[in-house]
Amino acid sequence: MQDKDCFTTENTIYIHDPPREVELFLIRFQQVYVIRYAKANGHKIPMPAEQTFTDHKILSLEEIGNRVRSWRKESRKLVFTNGCFDILHSGHVRYLQTAAGFGDILVLGLNSDSSVRKLKGPLRPIMTQADRAYLLSAIEAIDCIVIFDEETPARLIQSVSPDVLVKGGDYLPEDVVGYDTVTENGGCVKIVPYVEGKSTSGIVNSILEQS
């Protein structure tokens, strides 16, 4: 690449199937973004060589079931939220911190790459599910991450049966996927407004405009 600050290679903008050097730049961009945000807010994120703690946060559906049973025995209040989290930004982090404040344990359902494509089209996600999960696992507010392939987290919500289901945006609680599952078990649904001016689409458009 001729310019570290743009997504161009030989004056060509790659929107789909970028060359490996562009992919590596995107990954590094994401890592630097998260680390700088964390430092600015007084958090410590270890560099990759130190990040042995992250793997244990990423669980399979079977593993989350075992973990939930353990937390229930400890009378922990479980919170669940979900999303794509493609190009992590400060709005995501604030949202997750707010969600974590509703209980003791925050379980994050992360849309897989195939799930994101179904929801947002063939040009997404920008970051792979492995990269997204790795970066999210460095956020202290998140206790565990489960990647799911479906378009909605309905099956995962049934497995976790959270005390609090959190959704970002301007939904009515009863319109949120999992509402019936949670409320029938005595739980509740919380709606957290999005942070104005913070979005993955906005970041991508800004980068392309400057390239």
What are these regions (language model features)?
Residues 10-19, 28-33, 41:
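Short, low-complexity, charge-dense intrinsically disordered segments
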Residues 20-21, 164:
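Intrinsically disordered, low-complexity segments enriched in proline/serine/threonine
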Residues 24-26:
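Leucine-biased recognition of intrinsically disordered, low-complexity hydrophobic segments
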Residues 32-211:
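Nucleotidyltransferase catalytic core that binds NTPs
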